[in-house]
Amino acid sequence: MAAKKGKKTSTKKSDYYKVEGNTVERLKKVCPKCGAGVFMAEHLNRFACGKCGYLEYKKNEKAESEE
């Protein structure tokens, strides 16, 4: 019989917010299509939404400075 898999750990949602006094600040980018509550994953050259698949590419600062 196969060994049982361990329980999968989820990410802590509290890592996505910063609380200062009475204000709450989101630390990650929010998907413009899905709205508040759906954060976008940050990759090397883009931001991606895992829910709807929306992509937003980062500006290449090296290419802009060379022009």
From Swiss-Prot:
One biological process GO term for this chain? Answer: translation
Q: Which gene encodes it?
A: rps27ae
Q: Kindly list the GO molecular function terms attached to this UniProt entry.
A: structural constituent of ribosome; zinc ion binding
Q: Quick one: which residues bind Zn(2+)?
A: C31, C34, C49, C52
> What high-level taxonomic lineage is stated for the organism?
Archaea, Methanobacteriati, Methanobacteriota, Methanomada group, Methanococci
What family classification does the UniProt entry report for this protein? Belongs to the eukaryotic ribosomal protein eS31 family.
Kindly indicate whether the keyword NADP belongs to this entry. Answer: no
Question: Which cofactors does the annotated protein need, by name?
Answer: Zn(2+)
Pfam annotation, one family: Ribosomal_S27
The protein's organism comes out as: Methanococcus maripaludis (strain C6 / ATCC BAA-1332)
| C4-type zinc finger span | 31-52
Query: Which InterPro entries is this protein grouped with?
Result: Ribosomal_eS31, Ribosomal_eS31_arc, Ribosomal_zn-bd
What is its quaternary makeup? Part of the 30S ribosomal subunit.
| Keyword entries, A-Z | Metal-binding, Ribonucleoprotein, Ribosomal protein, Zinc, Zinc-finger
GO cellular component annotations of the record: ribonucleoprotein complex; ribosome
SUPFAM superfamilies reported in the protein's UniProt record: Zn-binding ribosomal proteins
Q: Relay the cofactor remark from the entry.
A: Binds 1 zinc ion per subunit.
Question: What SMART domains does the annotation carry?
Answer: Ribosomal_S27
Segments crossing the lipid bilayer: none
**This protein's name:** Small ribosomal subunit protein eS31
